Amino acid sequence: KKKALEKNFPKLIFEKKISELEKNIKNKDKSLIKVISSLKKFSWKNIPISISHGDLTMENILINKNDLIFIDLSKNFIDSYYLDLSKLLFDFICCWSFRFHNNGKSNIELDALKNRYINFLLENFDQNEIKNIKMLTLIDFLRVINYTKNINFLCLLKNNLKKLYDNFDNPLLW
């Protein structure tokens, strides 16, 4: 990593996104208010500008024999591999890509994959980088809560967001 050469996003971009999400979320409970408050207070330093998929979730990764195929690339509010990492973390935490198949409930295979992914993050990123990724994951949760209409899926999201937030520094409990 050549951190000195990396360009980072200005804090204002994150402040605007958080404000937009806050404005659009209806029925803010105590947990959502705490998450939004934490996002507003966060420094948002050192989020690198980079090439990014934009919507890297398990739904957008196809496996064909030994090949991985990435589909549904999209523009997001930032282009950063941190955002891609956060979206995968979001997906593993709440099994969002599998919400129609098992009501968002995890299973042994998904839990094992999630644990391997969390270990990958812990082994390859420092504490500040992981905190940035986790904070972006909180934004991912709020973004999806904004457009989710199904009450069961909304409960799934809110419960998993609370679990992540309440156990922010203990990845074993995500």
Residue ranges and their predicted role:
Residues 30, 132-136, 140-174:
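Regulatory N- and C-terminal appendages and interdomain linkers associated
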Residues 32-35, 114, 118, 129, ...:
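Short amphipathic alpha-helical segments that mediate assembly, nucleic-acid/protein binding
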Residues 38-83:
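Active-site acidic catalytic loop and adjacent metal/ATP-binding pocket
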Residues 65-74, 116-128, 164-171:
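Short amphipathic alpha-helical segments and their helix-coil junctions
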Residues 82-125, 138-153:
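Active-site activation/catalytic loop segments of kinase-like enzymes and analogous catalytic loops
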